[in-house]
Amino acid sequence: MKMNINLIRDILLQSEINKFIFPKFEESIYKRPKLEFLDKYTIPEVVYHLKIIEQEKLLEISFYRNSVEVRDLTAKGHFFLLEIRDNSVWEKTLNISKKISVSSLTALKDIAVQVSSSLIVNYFK
């Protein structure tokens, strides 16, 4: 499965608002949470990206037999989200990422920092 950075951003934005439990399987005893942003993704996609997010230490997540509990953003997750929260910064970050063909989370954060820095410099001109 390919990494979907928009899904990662959606999960981080939602986890800042509230915690949630997500089923690992369609037939899980846990019902899929009513989170609009997740409607466009499949359960396997969300679970896969939750694993990536957990491996990157952006969220505190517990994986159980039938579900995944998203508990809280880590400090690293908060700082990453600060860089990518604004939609205009996010769009510019994605455009630059595509132009230079890089898409790792680290690269995206670095690009977002540069985009934000550029906005700050331009503001004071």
Predicted segments with their positions:
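Non-catalytic, well-ordered alpha-helical scaffold segments
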Residues: 5-9, 44-47, 71, 75-78
